Amino acid sequence: MNLYALQTEINGKENAMLTLLDADTMAQVKNQRAIVGLLKNQKGPITHENILYNPTFIDFFHKTMLVFAEFAAGTNVITSNGFMYVVDERCKTPDKPEQKDIIGSFEVQAGVVLKDTYMANTNYQFISDDGLFKLPAQIERVLFMALV
């Protein structure tokens, strides 16, 4: 997945809009869900702290995680009861992820992932020092296809 910084004007002021779609595709589909956010400081770096995140994108992103439950439903879940964490693939220590690397979690009962129990992690960093979020390939495809 790529991140694009598109220059736009909002209320007469130049802004860098961060999107998951390139300029041509954004012009065609005009999908608000593809806008990750805006840079707070236009001259500053693209970092978690310098982004005003788009609530529409955040909501869409986490709803896409429900698809993860569909993929996980047929897999061996490590725990029989408890929680299964959805961990960003950028994470260098997936066995002991930091809060910033945990996308969210599902409840597990008797080894079954309960789809409707997804809880988003408010500490998750969509963009970190390690770059843009990284999901399993099939989930990234679902996310991208829903945008175009």
Task: List PLM regions with ranges.
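The transition from N-terminal targeting/processing segments to the mature protein
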Residues: 1-148
